[in-house]
Design a protein with these regions (language model features):
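ABC ATPase NBD coupling module
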Residues: 27-30, 81-98
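Conserved ABC ATPase "signature" region
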Residues: 79-80, 127-144
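Conserved ABC transporter NBD signature motif
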Residues: 72-80
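A short, flexible loop at the N-terminus of ABC-type nucleotide-binding domains that lies
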Residues: 9-13, 22-35, 86, 147
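Helix-to-loop junction immediately C-terminal to a conserved catalytic motif
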Residues: 64
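Short coil-to-helix segment of the ABC ATPase nucleotide-binding domain corresponding to the Q-loop/switch region
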Residues: 110-119
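Signature (C-motif/LSGGQ) region and adjacent switch/coupling loops
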Residues: 29, 85, 113, 129, ...
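The feature captures the beta-strand-to-loop junction immediately N-terminal to the Walker
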Residues: 49-51
Length: 151
């Protein structure tokens, strides 16, 4: 009994209610998600698995605020993503959500250091770029790759 009580006291960090997504291709509607209800509590890990085309990427894009649902809601740490503007949604994405994309690429014409600097510049953390990139690569044991390009 105490296990259930302990779990119920943990904060809900991701909540979807009747989440639906319909893509429109011309006049044709293609349902991607129908009525997804889920709650992820603080400290929990969730794996999204299924066959190709079942809606995994759509669900993750909705959870990340990259898409707006056709119906239903997504709340991240109590914030309804559909009820906030683009700037606030970007702030939530930066501060509360992490992404690891299946296909990620460094820019092939830039060094490892320059790729890190670019990412920091895009995300508004432009101070101490060179030091931060070097420190990060050193922490990862990649300081010898500082000036190498991905190719």
């Amino acid at each position: 009994m105490s296990k259930t009580i302990g779990m119920s006291q943990k904060k809900d960090v991701v909540v979807t209610e009747n989440l639906q997504m319909v893509y429109r291709i011309g006049k044709v509607e293609v349902p991607a998600l129908r009525g997804v209800d889920m709650t992820v509590k603080e400290g929990e890990f969730v794996a999204v698995m299924g066959p190709s085309g079942c809606g995994k990427s759509t669900l993750l894009h909705l959870l990340g605020g990259l898409l707006t649902p056709s119906a239903g809601s997504v709340r991240i740490d109590g914030i309804d993503l559909a009820s906030i503007g683009d700037n606030k949604r970007t702030e939530v994405r930066r501060n509360k959500i992490g992404f690891v994309f299946q296909r990620y690429n460094l820019l092939p014409t830039l060094s490892a250091e320059a790729n890190i600097e670019l990412a920091k510049r895009i995300h508004g953390n432009g101070h101490k770029l060179e030091t931060s990139a070097r420190e990060l690569l050193t922490m990862l044991g990649l300081e010898h790759k500082l000036h190498h390009k991905p190719s």
